[in-house]
């Protein structure tokens, strides 16, 4: 699973990275994590890498997380987005971009919410059998 953290604060990236590492070890899930300080660099990378899960801070300089998510959605409709912020002010706007979840910082105070977000966003591999059944149904 390709995961990105997009947050301009190194402390917040470190905290989320530790939460992800603990969660993935606990559930024995493989993942690759890439961290970005801003939306522009993230979008450049997202043009080359198919991220399945993105944790996006809303308040960032130059390009906020809402704009970065809007641009990501133009190219990747299936990516799960979890917004990160210190306030719920932009929650409605985030969900208009098909956000999967909305986490408040600091994560240390909202660990149960992080666990819930991961459960909702966890991507399961699609089996070959499922694809074959889907292809057969499409041909009917």
Protein language model features and the residues they cover:
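Residue-level signal for the "D+5" position in two-component response regulator receiver
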Residues: 35, 62-63, 137
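CheY-like receiver
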Residues: 44-45, 51-126
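Cytosolic catalytic cores of cyclic-nucleotide second-messenger enzymes
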Residues: 140
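Conserved sequence signature across two-component system core domains
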Residues: 6-7, 36, 54
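Short alpha-helical segment
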Residues: 40-42
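Two-component/phosphorelay signaling modules centered on CheY-like receiver
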Residues: 10-34
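Conserved small/polar residues in nucleotide/adenosyl-binding loops
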Residues: 129-136
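Non-catalytic signal-transmission and effector/linker regions of two-component phosphorelay proteins
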Residues: 1-4
């Amino acid at each position: 699973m390709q995961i990105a953290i997009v947050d301009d604060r190194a402390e917040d990236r470190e905290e989320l990275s530790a939460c992800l590492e603990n969660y993935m070890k606990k559930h024995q899930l493989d993942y690759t994590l890439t961290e970005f300080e801003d939306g522009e660099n993230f979008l450049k990378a997202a043009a080359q890498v198919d991220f399945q899960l993105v944790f996006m801070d809303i308040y960032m300089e130059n390009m906020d997380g809402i704009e970065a998510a809007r641009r990501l959605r133009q190219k990747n409709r299936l990516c799960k987005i979890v917004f990160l912020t210190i306030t719920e002010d932009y929650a409605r706007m985030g969900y208009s971009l098909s956000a999967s979840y909305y986490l408040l910082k600091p994560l240390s105070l909202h660990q149960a919410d992080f666990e819930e977000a991961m459960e909702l966003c966890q991507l399961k591999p699609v089996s070959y059998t499922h694809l074959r059944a889907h292809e057969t149904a499409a041909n009917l």
